[in-house]
């Protein structure tokens, strides 16, 4: 399946899931900004290469270190429930490979992301840069990798 078709299918699955849960989430559909972000950010770029054929399936995928990238519906739902406004800043604990941070950077003014596992944080930095979320230099005495994504830019410590 081509990426465009897989992404469109993923969006349809997310929309159907939101509609199915409309009573629980209090609305018939997720915020269009979140759906746009989900369609814009290439999920296959945030999973290990051997799992890229499954990137748009509505399943969590292993990313190493006994961690997973959440299934697309959960990423969309969590992001929607944050009700992010254009001037909001968001803190993410646990960067993983950067997918959630890339999604959050679409509706938010700034995203702070703290990597729990340094190796994943370094991989996330590279993947986010490839998506145009380049770092803004920042000093930090923290042993953890921290990034700030700001409308197309990111800050790492």
Question: How would you describe each model-predicted region?
Answer:
Residues 1-50:
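N-terminal auxiliary segments of SAM/dcSAM-dependent transferases
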Residues 4, 55-58, 77, 102-103, ...:
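Generic detector of short, locally flexible boundary/turn motifs and exposed helical patches
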Residues 16-21, 34, 50, 55-60, ...:
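Conserved alpha-helix/loop element of class I SAM-dependent methyltransferases that forms part
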Residues 81-157:
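Conserved nucleotide-cofactor-binding alpha/beta core module
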């Amino acid at each position: 399946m081509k990426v465009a078709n897989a992404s469109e299918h993923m969006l349809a699955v997310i929309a159907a899931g939101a509609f199915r849960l409309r009573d629980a989430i209090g609305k018939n559909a997720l915020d269009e900004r979140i759906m746009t972000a989900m369609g814009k950010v290439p999920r296959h770029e945030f999973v290990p290469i051997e799992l890229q054929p499954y990137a748009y399936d509505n399943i969590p995928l292993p990313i190493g270190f006994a961690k997973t990238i959440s299934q697309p519906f959960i990423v969309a739902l969590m992001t929607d429930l944050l009700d992010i406004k254009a001037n909001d800043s968001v803190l993410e604990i646990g960067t993983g490979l950067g997918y959630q941070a890339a999604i959050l950077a679409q509706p938010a003014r700034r995203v702070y992301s703290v990597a729990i596992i340094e190796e994943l944080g370094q991989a996330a930095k590279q993947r986010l840069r490839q998506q145009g979320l380049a770092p803004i230099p920042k000093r930090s005495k923290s042993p953890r990798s921290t990034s700030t994504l700001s409308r197309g830019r990111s800050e790492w410590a």
